[in-house]
Amino acid sequence: MKYKNILVTGSAGFIGFHLSKYLMDNYEDLKVIGIDNLNNYYNPVLKEKRNEILKNYENYTFIKLDFSDWDDLVENLKDKEIDLIVHLGAQAGVRYSLQNPWAYIKSNEMGTLNIFEFARRFDIEKVVYASSSSVYGGNRKIPFSEDDRVDKPISLYASTKRSNELMAHVYHHLYGIKMIGLRFFTVYGEYGRPDMAYFKFAKNILLGKEIEVYNYGNMERDFTYISDVVDGILRAIKKDFDYEIFNLGNSKPVKLMYFIELIEKYLNKKAKKKFLPMQDGDVLRTYADLSKSEKLLGYKPKVTIEEGLKRFCNWFLENKDWLLRL
């Protein structure tokens, strides 16, 4: 590994946690600085659990800060040795962006600007940052390719992620910073986000509560298991590109009703389903074209939806005593 001092934003988040843990498990001479504001968008108990696991590593340094606060960011990091930034921190969630749009501008716009500007001022040569499949909006052409138009987002969250890509190009063009954007497709797995459908489904099924099934179940998602996403991020870190955007998905869309059937099977309990109309800001289908990622990164997802959900459900059952209280 070329980089020895990596800053991971959102390190107590779902993807940030798994990436940080993988890096420290596999590279003894590598140090991770993790930053996170540990906000309460979802129950912070889960973020604390992830963070406590990471704090057990000697080569992990955690700093609680809000990277949308420029002065706080600089004050805490100006003296740290950093040679790569993996920017995963963000205000997540499509539906929540309809309720609290200001949170997205603050974190995803101002926060990302601050991270990019920090890289410029402190001579950090490369930033790998999280984008999202939501930038494809309501595009009807499938699968979604990096060359497709992405100028018609249908949620504020999506618009902020597209804005991040545009800012990244500016910082590459003006200052020569290497910028690699990764469009994640519905990431799932252990220690995932409680606001995500699969997590809510598992929790409510075990509690005997109804699960909400949008668009009457007529939806498909390109669910991507966390270990495949971490593999894609690692490849983006190691490969030497000046500016690129890549899809990181599974390229095998799963029908929502089959997805629910699998969770029922692995939890050994039937769901009580409440069928609802399509939600504002949602899309019918996501489907990643991985030809570019495979060609340039060598990225090939390995975990099937059956295997991934089995792992998640087993983990959930083993930890249900505290997970059901979230």
From Swiss-Prot:
Q: Which UniProt keywords apply?
A: Lyase, NAD
Protein name as it appears in the record: Uncharacterized protein MJ1055
The active site consists of: Y157
Q: Which CDD domains match?
A: UDP_GE_SDE_e
Instruction: List the Gene Ontology MF annotations in alphabetical order.
Output: lyase activity
Q: Which residues bind substrate?
A: S132
**Pfam families according to UniProt:** Epimerase
Question: Which residues fall in a coiled-coil region?
Answer: none
Q: Which InterPro entries match?
A: Epimerase_deHydtase, NAD(P)-bd_dom_sf
Spell out the family assignment given in the record's similarity comment: Belongs to the NAD(P)-dependent epimerase/dehydratase family. dTDP-glucose dehydratase subfamily.
Question: Is Lyase among the key words of this record?
Answer: yes
